[in-house]
Amino acid sequence: MSRIYCGGGGISTAVQASDKADSTTNRRYVGKLDSIQKINEVIIVGTPVIPKYREVIPAQVLKEVDLQRLNSLSVADAIRYFAGVQLKDYGGVGGLKTVNIRSMGTNHMAVFYDGIQLGNAQNGQVDLGRFSLDDVEEISLYNGQKSDIFQSAKDFGASGTIYITTRRPRFEEGKRANFKATMKTGSFGLINPSMRYEYKISDAVSSSFSGEWINATGRYKFRYRRRNTLGEIAYDTTAYRQNGDINATRMEAGLHGKMADGQWTVRAYTYNSERGIPGAIVNNVFRHGERLWDTNSFIQGTLTNRWSKKFRTLFNTKYAADYTHYENQDAKLIQTKNTY
């Protein structure tokens, strides 16, 4: 019994000693806090909250840094990294590439280039393969509409929307010009040189020009084998894909300006291509006579200005011209030669 009592007394003494130490420490800190203290300067740096992250429908976004890491040539190649997207490739290296979201068809998909809708009044399709990533700063995908007050009727009526934001010139201190040239090669005879030039006209106005050339033969080896109902090989053919070539040029020019409470942009675009349409792989058919020529050009302008915290204006204007020439010179089919 005495041993248990002594142990309890020891614990009690230790607690009293600890209370004394805490009391002394508190008095010391109270004395310091009762006087004026000097705090070192703290600088907090952060990025503004991007409006799309406050959207009702979240957006999938590919930034410029992400696009540079991707092994992609065009906007169509980059969009396949988004979830829930069905990329339709109509064959060949230069084949038409469109996007389908929510299984509602390509015609219900809206594509916007710097906030202005892209379209083709002839066929209603937007070929995303003709837009290079060299001039793109950001690609956003919405499974619906974005939560922005400035939207056209096409925004609200589309099942999905893609927003392509082009790159605005940025200059280091003391520099007035930027130049970049690239050369890409790949399979099937692909050659893709491109260049971009930016010039600072003044502190508020800058210009940009870019161009590229794409050429590919589209020839690749394939094997076509078929068995009959008994499981025996009916025929086994190895051949080269024909009529899958492309020869295309793209040029863009932009004029960018900044104001006290806004900014404006004028952009001109032209795309010219000649391509073959390889068609389906059919037994003993190795040559297709379908050819397609496209010329797509537009000039557009955007002006935004914030007059106050509650009042903001946006003006968009655009003129576009599209030309399509289609030929089918296959000897076994009805020959066609149409121009739109």
Feature roles, as predicted:
Residues 11-68, 76, 106:
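Short, acidic, small-residue-rich periplasmic hinge/interaction motif at the N-terminus
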Residues 40, 97, 158-160, 177-179, ...:
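Hydrophobic, lipid-facing positions within transmembrane beta-strands of outer-membrane proteins
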Residues 47, 144, 165, 182-188, ...:
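Outer-membrane beta-barrel pore domains and translocons
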Residues 76-120:
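Extracytoplasmic beta-strand/coil segments of soluble accessory domains associated
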Residues 133-180:
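A beta-strand signature from Gram-negative outer-membrane beta-barrel systems
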Residues 177-181, 207-209, 264-266, 312-317:
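Transmembrane beta-strands of outer-membrane beta-barrel proteins
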Residues 187-215, 227-274, 295-307:
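Transmembrane beta-barrel wall of Gram-negative outer-membrane proteins
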Residues 220, 242-248, 261-313, 319-339:
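Flexible loop and strand-edge segments within Gram-negative outer membrane beta-barrel domains
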